A protein has these predicted regions:
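P-loop NTPase Walker
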Residues: 1-111, 198, 219-222, 231, ...
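Conserved helicase NTPase motor core
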Residues: 2, 7-18, 22-26, 37, ...
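Helicase P-loop NTPase motor core
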Residues: 35-38, 53, 287-291, 297-403, ...
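Conserved P-loop NTPase-based nucleic-acid remodeling module centered on helicase motor cores
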Residues: 55-151, 276-280, 727-728, 743-747
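Conserved helicase core region in the C-terminal RecA-like lobe
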Residues: 90-100, 232-235, 260, 565-617, ...
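ATPase/helicase motor core of nucleic-acid motors
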Residues: 97, 284-287, 342-343, 369-508, ...
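Accessory C-terminal helicase-associated subdomains
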Residues: 181, 200, 372, 468-593, ...
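C-terminal accessory regions
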Residues: 462-465, 583, 615, 626-681, ...
Length: 964
């Protein structure tokens, strides 16, 4: 181990870094340098043991954690001068890694090309739209309950995901004696059939399909075991049964599996996680085989804060019937550091209501006037839920008194003025809405009051203002048209949305100045979210234009179902992964949200809480007879375990000052509750003379350096064509209006990819005309079903001809193919460069790059500008291939599949100087994007005719850059 490692790591960290043979359990207490240890262990494997990137698998809890790990490892390797392409590693969440396995081996799964991936809302909406299918099943209400259709779909989702995440054997369910479990079995069987019918996959089933792949295809498992030499898993205490089984399969005989976590911070039982995975990890191996390391030195918190949460855990009950459900550990500060003796754990309390909020406000002002607090973002409030009425009231009170609050998960999306005005605008544009929303004369939904009073009324009031007369003038003919629509329009709801953005009522939120405000452009982000919701709605309900035959139903579906369900469930607002504590704002976060973070000042609320039961009768039935393993933690005790772990996690986020706050309430539900009361009142009051923030030092919030990915086609070309388009659709993440996809080109590409895949597998003899047509038809059926676009028979015949011509021309040279559809990436100093190469072929020590174009070969003179852009794209790919593989690229080609009889190639010689200029230009564009420079010298009018944001741009007051 090099001196650089030794000087930075403590004894236990070094032990964890250097132990690479066999299973390793790292129990990492809060603030103990867990991420540092993970980074150094990866670097050690690469530099000292010469492990190749494709031999490493690293699982993180979030994609953000994966990006942070990639960034930190690449920076360390750069420090010591080691070139290594980290993106060859299997690194990411369980879901992303399993998805990669499925895509790499899709032919061995039930999945077909172009499958749909559901998020949680998509999954529930899918079930909601089919709830009547489930109501036909015997005893379905034992699973779904007897609530509304939406409530039943929510219950159904919960139980279906539990079956999947617990890896419960469907055959065991099918043979159940309990009526509830029989009903669940029928629901599960139906759901799996529906997923297969729609070629869909939800998040839980990503892992189930991956497990099924590994268990049913020994050749796939053997290949992965032979490839993956070292496995590392972060946050192991929050893994579930199916994830544990996947790891057990992948680790193979060498068992070089390193798991890292803290059983005291296991928070995700409600998502299927089980603490038994980390507590029983050593038992998976022969006695003495698993090497345990405990990281217990806390580099984050003041010793008094550490002592407070140590005592909190020591007071919990962790042993039941002789079995212990916690690793014994005591967190301690570094021995060689000096700390001040001022109180660092204090309380804020006052009677419930305004008095408590005033007291919290006074405390914050004391911190501010102390002169030691440099930014409000050094303060974070942590609660069980930020949707709680007391929490929402406190946030509003503080904002009204000049303290900005950042609370992206408080579900205030539908309370924001810009969202309410948008909904009001849509109601205004469809005068029939008050009548068509009713399914009978006496019908009423609670959300109609929100629409009428909170959305329509304020929008109507805005229209009375002189500055909004252009908006009224634009709307009036549309109101008339929509009220008596006789012919299909040439737009849908999303088209109206982008028209609305041209008016100052909404455009004011999109200017560069608004995005630099304290709230970091929250309103603009909310408008972007609304565009995504409309896009999703139109896709789910097959809407491409407003059609008089379906308009009334579309309005009911949008307002009575889609928006209502989103309103009831709540929508989080924008969160920037690279800035978890925005400057100028006090953070209001859930404890779960704060996991893994740290703040100089942490104020923990929700002290009126107590342990609460989190399981149902059906949970108990499944636990005691149907799970793959016997019960572990006693169900009756889980509420206490979870309660102690939750607040331990909260308390341990604090660096310099930990504050406990509670309103005071008597009666049968006292606040603070009995679980906190003694500890709470034993703390010094913040008004005590002993509390002297003037004498304290508050750290600054740590910056997070996350490298972002950039590709030539998705980023550089878009930015160069129009920086304003880039700002909208990439930076602010607006969703463009759905247009008919280029089905022809995609179909040709996918079928050629099928050909290459078989050839690379050594089965070129299978590439017959009949087989190619079979692949082609299967691809077309899947594409057409997903995109809801169909091709005429003559067009289909032409597309098949493109593929057949390619096969006939190239079949004698299949042996030159080395790789196909290669997603390649390169971690650079400032960003990650990515690309996707259609084909890499080679001979005599060099390789050539081929990019397919499903069109006729263009006129080389007339299309010179377009061909030059393609050449730059190929040069980026050549740079990626050479840097990633070390192979020399000799030539680059465009292959035009539509060329009937002539040469289908347009070829470019590789020139190192030209490539260097292209990469330098790429770097310059990325630098502009990274610093938020979207200025233009003029509008690129050739891009405007079909652009969704043209109405906005036509009315924008431009500030063009001066040409050099």
């Amino acid at each position: 181990m090099t001196t650089a490692y030794a000087s930075r790591a403590n004894k236990k960290q070094r032990e964890a870094i250097l132990h690479t043979d066999g299973p390793l359990l790292i129990i990492a207490g809060p603030g103990s340098g867990k991420t540092f240890t993970l980074v150094e262990r990866v670097v050690y494997l690469i530099t000292e043991l010469h492990v190749a990137p494709e031999e490493l698998l690293v699982v993180t809890f979030t994609e953000k954690a994966a990006r942070e790990l990639i960034t930190r490892v690449s920076n360390r390797l750069n420090e010591i001068g080691v070139r290594f392409n980290l993106n060859e590693m299997y690194i990411g969440t369980f879901h992303s890694i399993c998805l990669r396995l499925l895509e790499d081996h899709r032919e061995f799964t039930r999945l077909k090309r172009n499958f749909t991936l559901f998020d949680e809302f998509d999954q529930q909406y899918f079930l909601y739209q089919r709830i009547w299918d489930y109501r036909k099943l015997p005893d379905y209400e034992l699973v779904t309950g007897d609530g509304s259709s939406w409530a039943q779909s929510e219950e159904l989702l919960k139980w279906l995901n539990k079956v999947t995440e617990e890896a419960i054997d469907p055959m065991v369910l099918a043979g159940a004696r309990d009526r509830e479990v029989q009903a669940l079995s029928w629901c599960h069987t139906l759901y799996q059939m529906q997923l297969e019918e729609h070629n869909a996959l939800d998040f839980a089933n990503i892992q189930a399909e991956a497990l099924r792949l590994l268990e049913s295809r020994p050749e796939v498992l053997a290949k992965l075991r032979g490839q993956l030499k070292y496995l590392m898993v972060d946050e192991y205490q929050d893994t579930n049964t199916i994830q544990e089984r996947i790891l057990s399969l992948l680790m193979g005989e060498a068992r070089n599996l390193c798991v890292v976590g803290d059983d005291d911070q296991g928070l995700y039982r409600f998502r299927g996680a089980t603490i038994r995975n980390i507590l029983e990890f050593p038992l998976k191996f022969p006695a003495g085989r698993c090497h345990p390391v405990t990281l217990s030195i806390n580099y984050r918190s003041h010793p008094d804060i550490i002592d407070f949460y140590n005592r909190w855990m020591a007071d919990g009950t962790w042993e039941v019937n002789g079995q212990r459900f916690r690793y014994a550990k005591t967190i301690k500060p570094p021995e060689d550091e000096d700390f001040h003796a001022l109180p660092t754990v204090v309380r804020i309390n006052a009677p419930i209501g305004d008095a408590w909020m005033e007291e919290v406000h006074a405390f914050l002002l004391r911190l501010q006037t102390s002169g030691q607090l440099s930014d409000w973002n050094q303060v974070a409030f942590l609660f069980r839920s930020v949707k709680n009425g007391h929490v929402v009231a406190l946030a509003k009170y503080l904002e009204q008194h000049g303290i900005p609050i950042y609370s992206p998960r408080s579900n205030q999306f539908f309370d924001r003025e810009e969202v309410r005005l948008l909904i009001g605008a849509f109601i205004f544009l469809f005068p029939q809405f008050p009548e068509v929303r009713k399914w009978d004369a006496n019908a009423h939904l609670d959300i109609w009051d929100y629409y009428d009073e909170n959305c329509f009324r304020p929008f109507a009031e805005q229209l009375r203002k002189p500055e909004n007369r252009p908006l009224l003038a634009w709307a009036q003919p549309l109101i008339k048209r929509h009220g008596t629509l006789a012919q299909p329009a040439d737009y849908a709801f999303s088209g109206l949305f982008y028209q609305l953005l041209q008016f100052p009522l909404f455009a004011q939120h999109l200017e560069e100045e608004a995005l630099r405000g304290v709230d970091k452009g929250r309103a603009a982000r909310n408008l972007a979210t609304f565009s995504t919701l409309l896009n999703k709605f139109e896709y789910l309900h097959h809407i491409s234009v407003l059609n008089p035959a379906y308009l009334d139903k579309n309005l009911r579906d949008l307002f009575n179902q889609f928006l209502r369900f989103l309103y009831d469930g709540g929508i989080g607002e924008y969160e920037d992964d690279s800035e978890y504590a925005p400057s100028g704002c006090v953070s209001f976060l859930t404890i779960h949200q704060a996991k893994g973070l740290e703040f100089p000042v942490v104020v923990v609320g929700s002290l009126e809480a107590g342990p609460r039961k989190q399981y149902t009768d059906l949970d108990a039935i499944l636990e005691n007879g149907y799970l793959a393993k016997p019960p572990f933690e006693p169900l009756d005790y889980t509420k206490y375990f979870d309660f102690w772990r939750l607040f331990y996690t909260a308390f341990s986020r604090a660096q310099n000052l930990l504050v406990l706050t509670s309103f005071e309430r008597g009666g049968t539900q006292p606040a603070p509750s009995k679980y906190f009361s003694d500890r709470f009142y034993a703390l010094p009051d913040w008004r005590s003379p002993a509390f002297q923030p003037e004498q304290m030092t508050f750290e600054r919030v740590k910056a997070i350096n996350l490298k972002r990915e950039y590709s030539f086609t998705s980023h550089i070309t878009l930015f160069e064509n129009c920086a304003e388009q880039y700002r909208f659709f990439k930076e602010l993440e607006f969703t463009p209006i759905r247009v008919s996809p280029m089905l022809f080109g995609t179909l040709v590409h996918q079928t050629i990819e099928d050909v290459h895949k078989i050839v690379l597998r050594g089965e070129a003899h299978r590439v017959t005309a009949k087989q190619v047509e079979t692949w082609f038809q299967a691809n077309y059926q899947n594409l057409a079903k997903k995109e809801r676009v169909y091709l005429a028979p003559t067009t289909l015949k032409a597309a098949l001809g493109h593929v057949m011509r390619y096969v006939q021309r190239e079949s004698s040279r299949w042996d030159r193919i080395q790789e196909a559809e290669v997603d390649i990436s390169l971690v650079k100093d400032e960003y990650i460069l990515t690309g996707s190469v259609d084909l890499i072929r080679g001979e005599r020590g060099t390789v050539e790059i081929v990019d397919f174009k499903s069109e006729k070969k263009p006129d080389l003179e007339k299309e010179r500008e377009r061909l030059q852009r393609y050449q730059r794209q190929l040069e980026v790919y050549a740079h990626l291939v050479e840097e990633r593989t070390g192979q020399r690229v000799s030539r680059m080609h465009l292959y035009y599949t539509g060329e009937d009889s002539g040469n289908p190639y347009v070829s470019f010689e590789k020139n190192d100087k030209t490539i260097a200029r292209t990469i330098a230009g790429f770097d310059a564009v990325v630098h502009r994007i990274e610093r938020g420079d979207y200025g233009m010298v003029a509008r690129p009018h050739k891009m405007c005719p079909d652009c969704d944001i043209r109405p906005y741009c036509d009315n924008k007051t431009w500030k063009f850059k001066q040409t050099p």
